[in-house]
Amino acid sequence: MNLGTLVSETRNPQTMDLDALPTPELVKRFNEQDTRVAEAVKATLPDVARAVDAAAAALKSGGRIIYMGAGTSGRLGVLDASECPPTFGVPHGLVVGLIAGGPGALLKAVEGAEDSQQAGEDDLVALNLQEQDLVVGLAASGRTPYVIGGLRYARQSGCTTVAVSCNPDSPIAREANIAISPVVGPEALTGSTRLKSGTAQKMVLNMISTGAMVKFGKVYQNLMVDMKATNVKLVDRACRMVVEATGIGREEAEALLKQTDFEVKPAILMALTGLDAAAAREKLAAHQGFLRAALEH
């Protein structure tokens, strides 16, 4: 493949003079380019919705969401995966981020790590990949061998696969059941796909993980009711969520949370139904953790 023909590698005619610009104009040019990212992502929303449903289906069937990528793309996957346990109360390992070259590549580039299809397969083998898992391959260029190898192995293993790329009709898209391709155009700094391409990928990942967790019962209204209250800020947030969801006073909310070890969902259910903590947990379990269903039935 001639990489120079990729949209993400071509020069942007609107930023040819970056090195001659005064600082206010320099940052204005970057900002002007960034405004195009949301529109590019908007054009992919039908495919993002399919990915959300596939991710939720994977979780409900006992599978995992596995992101894999190299460089910036890999780091974004690891970032999104690492935020899921504290935000949604899920166990570590339910959402996984793989980066070419291993964890050390998060801080320092591992030269050549992305160029091996076998490495992508090997990393999934090491995770004991199961057909219930969803594998999401991330590559701004759409042609990273590490990601191609991983997606190909995942597909052969019976997994649903998703490709996220910022070039149209990319090689990784052809390896996936669902292709998401926000074409953001040439970068302000030629080929620096940590810019618009990285922003677009982050926006897509935000929707995939958050949307899947909504459909997995981890959200009530727009509240992260399975959040782990692990510090003073989050204990305060837990209290505010109970107050906002129920209309009770703060002192009563704090008292309920102490009975639930600061778990928000049973505290809300207790406030709205009069159940005790054990009965609230039992009712939530009977409705697979969906608070709305527990309240309505």
Curated annotation (Swiss-Prot):
Complex and partners: Homodimer.
Primary role: Specifically catalyzes the cleavage of the D-lactyl ether substituent of MurNAc 6-phosphate, producing GlcNAc 6-phosphate and D-lactate. Together with AnmK, is also required for the utilization of anhydro-N-acetylmuramic acid (anhMurNAc) either imported from the medium or derived from its own cell wall murein, and thus plays a role in cell wall recycling.
Gene Ontology terms: biological process: 1,6-anhydro-N-acetyl-beta-muramic acid catabolic process; amino sugar catabolic process; N-acetylmuramic acid catabolic process; peptidoglycan turnover
Induction summary: Induced by MurNAc 6-phosphate that releases the repressor MurR from the DNA. Repressed by MurR in the absence of MurNAc 6-phosphate.
Involved pathway(s): Amino-sugar metabolism; 1,6-anhydro-N-acetylmuramate degradation; Amino-sugar metabolism; N-acetylmuramate degradation; Cell wall biogenesis; peptidoglycan recycling
SUPFAM superfamilies linked: SIS domain
SIS domain span: 55-218
Note: A lyase-type mechanism (elimination/hydration) is suggested for the cleavage of the lactyl ether bond of MurNAc 6-phosphate, with the formation of an alpha,beta-unsaturated aldehyde intermediate with (E)-stereochemistry, followed by the syn addition of water to give product.
Superkingdom field: Bacteria
UniProt catalytic activity: N-acetyl-D-muramate 6-phosphate + H2O = N-acetyl-D-glucosamine 6-phosphate + (R)-lactate
Pfam families: GKRP_SIS_N
Active site: 83 (proton donor), 114
HAMAP family: MurQ
Entry's EC annotation: 4.2.1.126
GO MF entry, a single one: carbohydrate derivative binding
Gene: murQ
Name of this chain's protein: N-acetylmuramic acid 6-phosphate etherase
Keywords: Carbohydrate metabolism, Lyase
Family: Belongs to the GCKR-like family. MurNAc-6-P etherase subfamily.
InterPro entries assigned: Etherase_MurQ, Glucokinase_regulatory_CS, MURQ/GCKR, SIS_dom, SIS_dom_sf
Native source species: Salmonella choleraesuis (strain SC-B67)
